[in-house]
């Protein structure tokens, strides 16, 4: 049957002995096997479970015991509370699971002027960008963070200072959170860059993974930088972290956490002031909980996650 093995007994009761045994089709067998596996993961909920009323009547994939999770350290797919996660970003067991909140800096002068920013330190927050940073801070008023990491580049640094205002712990600046270096394109308007360097600009916009100058591939390099940043962040003592940085490195952070390659760079978009949230198992494996939340930009929304 095309190599498909049936791992459960076929129903024989009620079949005449003289009749040949009907052989289910491959599609039927797959459906039966799917249902069998699904039923093994489902537990009918009667009344209450752990003092929480079961809304849908079904409990799916109950949380495994802590010692069971620890036995899966450093293995892909052994993450806490979910299956088939990504490869460990720490390569070592952490003392606890962690949550990381990622925020892109507020609107900057070069954002407003449609200029290529890159790693330049000349672009600063606008008045709108300052208000966006304040909105981010207000939206997270119910959240507690053990540390805040930031790019040292001015637009991200200013955003982090607003977010971390009134905290006793100092901000932690990481060079691994700096934006990608885009060489002589930095500071140019997008229109001028497209006009003066059409092939290079087209490569940057349409095939960023293969965009290169003098043999240097900024986006491919950014993937290594992002992995370095994750390791620095996750191995810091604490359980809840805030990270403030730039669009390109945020894309790399999100993609590397999800196991995506540089070719997927533009598959992720993050707005100014956009908030994304990851949960990490003890094994350093990531689960994306929220991506580019912006409700706080248009209302007084307060997050609880």
For the regions a protein language model found, what residue spans apply to each?
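Acidic, His/Gly-rich catalytic cores of divalent-metal-dependent hydrolytic chemistry
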Residues: 286-305
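Phosphate-coordination/substrate-recognition cap region in phosphate-metabolizing enzymes
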Residues: 3-97, 134-202, 276
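Active-site-adjacent alpha-helix immediately C-terminal to a catalytic or transition-state-stabilizing loop
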Residues: 2, 19-37, 157, 168, ...
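Loop-to-helix element that buttresses phosphate recognition and phosphoryl-transfer chemistry
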Residues: 107-163, 212-227
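Short, P/G- and charge-enriched loop/turn segments at secondary-structure junctions
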Residues: 88-90, 262-266, 302-305
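Short, hydrophobic/glycine-enriched beta-strand segments
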Residues: 97-106
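Short, well-ordered beta-to-alpha junction loops that form the rim of enzyme active sites
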Residues: 106, 151-153, 176, 244-248, ...
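Phosphate-handling substructures
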Residues: 110, 120-124, 163-228, 287
């Amino acid at each position: 049957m095309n190599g498909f093995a049936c791992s459960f007994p076929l129903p024989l009761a009620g079949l005449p002995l003289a009749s040949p045994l009907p052989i289910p089709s491959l599609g039927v067998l797959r459906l039966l096997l799917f249902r069998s596996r699904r039923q093994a993961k489902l537990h009918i909920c009667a009344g209450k479970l752990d003092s929480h009323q079961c809304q849908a009547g079904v409990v799916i994939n109950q949380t495994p015991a802590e010692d069971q999770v620890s036995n899966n350290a450093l293995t892909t797919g052994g993450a806490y509370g979910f299956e088939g996660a990504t490869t460990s970003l720490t390569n070592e067991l952490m003392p606890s699971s962690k949550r990381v909140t990622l925020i892109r800096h507020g609107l900057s002068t070069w954002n407003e002027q449609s200029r290529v920013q890159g790693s330049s330190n000349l672009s600063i927050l606008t008045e709108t960008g300052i208000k966006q940073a304040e909105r981010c801070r207000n939206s997270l008023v119910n959240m507690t963070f053990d540390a805040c990491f930031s790019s040292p580049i001015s637009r991200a640094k200013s955003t982090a200072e607003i977010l971390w205002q009134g905290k006793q712990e100092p901000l932690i600046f990481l060079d691994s959170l700096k934006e990608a270096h885009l060489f002589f394109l930095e500071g140019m308007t997008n229109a001028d860059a497209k006009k003066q360097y059409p092939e290079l600009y087209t490569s940057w916009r349409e095939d960023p993974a293969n965009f290169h100058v003098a043999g240097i591939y900024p986006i491919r390099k950014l993937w290594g930088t992002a992995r370095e940043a994750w390791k620095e962040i996750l191995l810091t003592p604490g359980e809840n972290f805030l990270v403030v940085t730039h669009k390109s490195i945020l894309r790399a952070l999100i993609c590397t956490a999800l196991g995506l390659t540089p070719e997927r760079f533009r598959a992720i978009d993050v707005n100014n002031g956009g908030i994304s949230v990851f949960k990490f198992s003890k094994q350093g494996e990531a689960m994306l909980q929220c991506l580019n939340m912006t409700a706080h930009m248009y209302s007084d929304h307060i997050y609880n996650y």
